[in-house]
Every structure is written in C-alpha cells, then in structure tokens.
C-alpha cells in the first residue's frame, strides 16, 4: 500500500513540473517510513514549535488540494500547490529573518523526509515573493536606523541651542543687575557720608555755642565785665542760634 502511495506521488510530482527525482535513485526507497497520523499535518507537526509566530497559521494549509495523505511529510514537500500556498502566506505575514527561519525549517524537514534537492519545492513565483519579503525588512530596518539617527541629531542640536540661549539670558541679566546694585550702593554710601558730615557740623556748632555761653555766664557772675561787654557777648551768642 505504501509503495503504491509513493509511486503515485512521484508520478504526480513529475507531471506537475516539480524537480525530477535524480537518476539512479529508487523512488521506493528514498522516503523513510513516517507515522501515519498528525495533529496538524505531516509538514507542520515536526517544526511547528520552532516557527516564528507569523508563520504558524500558514503551515495549517489544507492538504485536500494534493493526493497526499495529510500525515505524509515527503509527499507534502513535493506538492507545489501545498508548498506554494504555505510560502505565499509566509511572504505576506513574515519579514526579514522570520522568512529565512521558515525556509530553513522547511528545507530541513523535507530533507529529513528523504526529498531530493531543493527539498521544499515551491514555485519560482513564491520563491521570489519570499526573497522580497526578506529584503523589505532589511530596507525598513535601514530606514528606521537613519530616522532614529536624524531625530537624535535634531534633539541634540535643540538642546545645545537651548543651553546657549539660557546662558546668554543669564549673562545679560547679571550685567543688568550689577550696575543697578553698584549705583544703589554708591547712593547709600554717599547719603551716609552726607548725614555723618551734617551731624558732625551740628555737633561742632552746639559745642561752640555751649563754650561761649559758659564763658559769658562765668564773666557775668564774676562781675568783672562791664555791662556793655556782657550785652555784646549775649548778642553774639544769640546770633549763633
């Protein structure tokens, strides 16, 4: 039964234009025996846990478009209608390293199942789509890096400008404040000196008047000065006030 299944696979694959079996190989012996059951399908089960999230739904493609038993890994690997559907889904949903990871896992599982090179047999159009998906991620990464670099330079320039503006404003404020404080100090000092001089002058005048008055009183009391002289002294004292 298994031999008939493998023979039908080889015949269908050849008719569909899939890579031919290398000459000299026996199509009945190149496929290892596989378990005749699968939780998803023979292609997905053994690599599902290692797939990137973007590809996990892709490997759940229906196997009804193929003559393969759903559990037959080798048969599914050589069916372009199944492999192509998986590949197109990956190209739409995955980018960059994710694409490379899926291709590597698919190649590995198909090689382990005994399929000949190129192992995972997808149409050329699907291969091109996968290549573009991988390249698109690389270009996006480069653009993102450039944008981040430009943003960082702009931010740095703005910070430098802000610091220079703040420094200039601080310097200007200091210059404006210094003359005002100096002028105020000078005015205060001048006023203090004027007040001190005035107080000194008043003190001296008071002292002189007191001295004169003392002399006049003493002379009057002694009775040694004529009345006219005493009157003149009193007039002189009065003039001082």
Swiss-Prot record:
Any one cellular component term from GO for this entry? plasma membrane
Boundaries of every CFEM domain copy: 26-137
Instruction: Name where it's found.
Output: Secreted, Cell wall; Cell membrane
Q: What induces it?
A: Induced by iron starvation, hypoxia, amphotericin B, and during hyphal growth. Repressed by ketoconazole and caspofungin. Regulated by BCR1, HOG1, SFU1, TUP1, and UPC2.
Function as written in the Swiss-Prot or TrEMBL entry: GPI-linked hyphal surface heme-binding protein involved in heme-iron utilization. Heme transfer occurs between PGA7, RBT5 and CSA2 supporting a model in which the 3 CFEM proteins cooperate in a heme-acquisition system and form a cross-cell wall heme-transfer cascade. The ability to acquire iron from host tissues is a major virulence factor of pathogenic microorganisms. Required for biofilm formation.
Q: List the disulfide bonds.
A: 54-94, 58-89, 68-75, 77-110
The Gene Ontology terms for molecular function here are: heme binding; metal ion binding
Question: Mind telling me which residues form the propeptide?
Answer: 222-241
What organism is the protein native to?
Candida albicans (strain SC5314 / ATCC MYA-2876)
Could you name the domain of life of the organism this protein comes from?
Eukaryota
Q: Identify the gene encoding this protein.
A: RBT5
Q: What is this protein called?
A: GPI-anchored hemophore RBT5
Family recorded in the similarity comment: Belongs to the RBT5 family.
Q: Keywords, A to Z?
A: Cell membrane, Cell wall, Disulfide bond, Glycoprotein, GPI-anchor, Heme, Iron, Lipoprotein, Membrane, Metal-binding, Secreted, Signal
Q: What are the leading ranks of the lineage? A: Eukaryota, Fungi, Dikarya, Ascomycota, Saccharomycotina
Q: Indicate, by first and last residue, each region the UniProt record lists as having compositional bias (Low complexity).
A: 140-154, 163-182, 200-210
Can you summarize the PTM annotation of this record?
Answer: The GPI-anchor is attached to the protein in the endoplasmic reticulum and serves to target the protein to the cell surface. There, the glucosamine-inositol phospholipid moiety is cleaved off and the GPI-modified mannoprotein is covalently attached via its lipidless GPI glycan remnant to the 1,6-beta-glucan of the outer cell wall layer. Mannosylated.
